[in-house]
Amino acid sequence: FEYICLQLSHPELTRRPPETWEQHQTRLDQHHKARRQRSTYTVAFRLLNAADFGVPQRRERVFFVGFRSDLGTRWRFPEATHSEAAMLRDQWVTGHYWDRHKIGKKQRPEPPARVAAQVAKHQELDLFNTTPWATVRDAISDLPDPETVQQHGIPNHSFNPGARSYPGHTGSPLDLPAKTLKAGDHGVPGGENMLRRPDGSVRYFTIREAARL
């Protein structure tokens, strides 16, 4: 990671054959720390989660932004607009989430054990500066179940059989943002590109659902 930052800060110091990347990093670091030397580019970085910006998928990526140092530009990354805390409160404190999806109290699942303490904390708070994370249910609940309804006229919304859960690949819960979706050679691939229903059963996301997510 540090090597990438140094390379972006000093792109003029390229690697010299047969120099290894470790040797190149050492030379970049020495150049960077020399007081008489100034970075060619000012580089800022931050780890961002797509779910924090309204995407119904937890997808974390590191973003690098660089400007020529002589421009004096100061970059600020955007602040999150959505949060897990607001989602938990929406689901387990106010219940507005279930009301929006017209799910009666008897049909609502129990709060996961891992969020019990968080729910208790959020119950004391009345104001949030962010919107709840968008969930899989938020994104695809208006689409018919492709396993039971096959004549719907929606493009790329066909059931793909064969989904199964195994350690490390359990699918995306309906009432959370989807796990990171991955591309594959056969439409929507397996692994984490599955929906896990409240009863524990799984099925593959259709291509249309994956596009929504």
Please state what every model-predicted region is.
Residues D138-S141, K179, A211:
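Internal, well-ordered alpha-helical scaffold/interface segments
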Residues P161-L195:
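Internal helical hairpin/lid segments
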Residues F1-L174:
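Class I S-adenosyl-L-methionine
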Residues L195-L213:
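Low-complexity, glycine/alanine/valine/leucine- and proline-rich hydrophobic stretches
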Residues S39-Y41, L71-T73, P177, G191-N193, ...:
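Generic structural motif recognizing short loop/turn segments at the entrances and edges of beta-strands
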Residues R68, D185-G187, E209:
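A broadly conserved detector of short glycine/acidic/proline-rich loop/turn motifs that flank catalytic sites
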